[in-house]
């Protein structure tokens, strides 16, 4: 099995606590509201903390598909959230799982700095393709911007 790491960092004008609330605390309800392709997020097993399995149902290419996410860490104090895609349509055939480690911290002018590490755990010595990496980054960036936009459009949130 190979492990391939990718890191990304972005900034937001939204304070870490408000952004974390949208990205983590309320995400199961907010994401289907702000991302048209995502129909639902439901807990299949667990209570929302580490070890919880969530089913994310989405439409891609006119077909309804799903991903299974396993929550690895929820740290509300330090604004950190880690999870892995462990099954479903979001995993390429050459990948066992994709893990995401995210952390928000205070940024300039009351905003946030978001750091993300993505780890592809591949089968054998396969490497993720550039297309898979670019597609995953685009989806992640879109999700982040959609939730950030929701918070900005709803000042009382």
Swiss-Prot record:
<dbReference type="GO" id="GO:0006952">
    <property type="term" value="P:defense response"/>
</dbReference>
<dbReference type="GO" id="GO:0005634">
    <property type="term" value="C:nucleus"/>
</dbReference>
<dbReference type="GO" id="GO:0010427">
    <property type="term" value="F:abscisic acid binding"/>
</dbReference>
<dbReference type="GO" id="GO:0009738">
    <property type="term" value="P:abscisic acid-activated signaling pathway"/>
</dbReference>
<dbReference type="GO" id="GO:0004864">
    <property type="term" value="F:protein phosphatase inhibitor activity"/>
</dbReference>
<dbReference type="InterPro" id="IPR050279">
    <property type="entry name" value="Plant_def-hormone_signal"/>
</dbReference>
<keyword id="KW-0611">Plant defense</keyword>
<dbReference type="InterPro" id="IPR000916">
    <property type="entry name" value="Bet_v_I/MLP"/>
</dbReference>
<comment type="similarity">
    <text>Belongs to the BetVI family.</text>
</comment>
<protein>
    <recommendedName>
        <fullName>Class-10 pathogenesis-related protein 1</fullName>
    </recommendedName>
</protein>
<keyword id="KW-0568">Pathogenesis-related protein</keyword>
<dbReference type="InterPro" id="IPR024949">
    <property type="entry name" value="Bet_v_I_allergen"/>
</dbReference>
<dbReference type="GO" id="GO:0038023">
    <property type="term" value="F:signaling receptor activity"/>
</dbReference>
<dbReference type="GO" id="GO:0005737">
    <property type="term" value="C:cytoplasm"/>
</dbReference>
<dbReference type="InterPro" id="IPR023393">
    <property type="entry name" value="START-like_dom_sf"/>
</dbReference>
<dbReference type="Pfam" id="PF00407">
    <property type="entry name" value="Bet_v_1"/>
</dbReference>
